[in-house]
Design a protein with these regions (language model features):
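Short Gly/Thr/Asp-enriched flexible loops that form oxyanion-binding sites at enzyme active sites
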Residues: 67-75, 141-142
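Active-site-facing substrate-recognition patch
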Residues: 1-54
Length: 187
């Protein structure tokens, strides 16, 4: 079967997203910012213009990392926080929550180090990710922030996929449709 693509213009950057089957009836556009500094920087700069004031950014491992890093760098080398997919030996007093993502077929957990959790207490936290689809990963990050005593001041992503584009609490740059099995956008 020939690979199908979905063409997008994201803040002036033209990209062709390969379509990948999610199941026998549905495909998604694969959006990957790893290794794409032009797109990452352009998206980070535009999101910074649109998001509310915040004290810290938090993202989930792994695809949100380049975006959070670049947003923090552009905002003056601010510290950002990372929810890991697995606990690390150096992490102490870990907070963790479970998450189900559209791109994984099993339950996952997100973990935040106790020091980062302490940083969030009473602070305005901006949750950032590359793509929001079902909102499950976003919900897991919200739970971590709330358990740490942080104040969620906003949620931002590059692409809002499917129904996520209808969320009133989400700042995003572009809509990404879901696709039928033939690769046609479902709008």
């Amino acid at each position: 079967m020939e690979q199908k693509y979905y063409h997008m213009n994201i803040v002036g950057c033209e990209r062709d997203l390969p379509l990948c089957p999610l199941n026998e009836h549905l495909m998604i556009g694969a959006f990957v910012i790893f290794g794409d500094p032009e797109l990452t920087t352009a998206c980070a700069a535009e999101l910074l213009r649109r998001v509310p004031a915040y004290d810290y950014i938090i993202t989930a491992e792994a695809k949100g990392i380049p975006l959070a890093h670049e947003m923090a760098r552009l905002a003056g080398n601010q510290r950002y926080l990372l929810a890991r997919k697995g606990p690390k030996l150096y992490m102490r007093h870990i907070l963790d929550v479970s998450v189900h993502s559209i791109t994984t077929d099993r339950e996952q957990h997100l973990y935040v180090d106790g020091e980062d959790a302490a940083r969030m207490k009473g602070k305005r936290i901006l949750i950032v990710d590359d793509v929001v689809s079902t909102g499950e990963s976003l919900h897991a990050l919200e739970t971590l922030v709330n358990e740490a005593g942080g104040i969620i001041c906003g949620r931002a992503c590059i692409l809002a996929e499917g129904e996520a584009a209808n969320r009133s609490d989400l700042v995003y740059l572009e809509k990404l449709p879901l696709f039928d099995a033939a690769g046609n956008p479902l709008d």
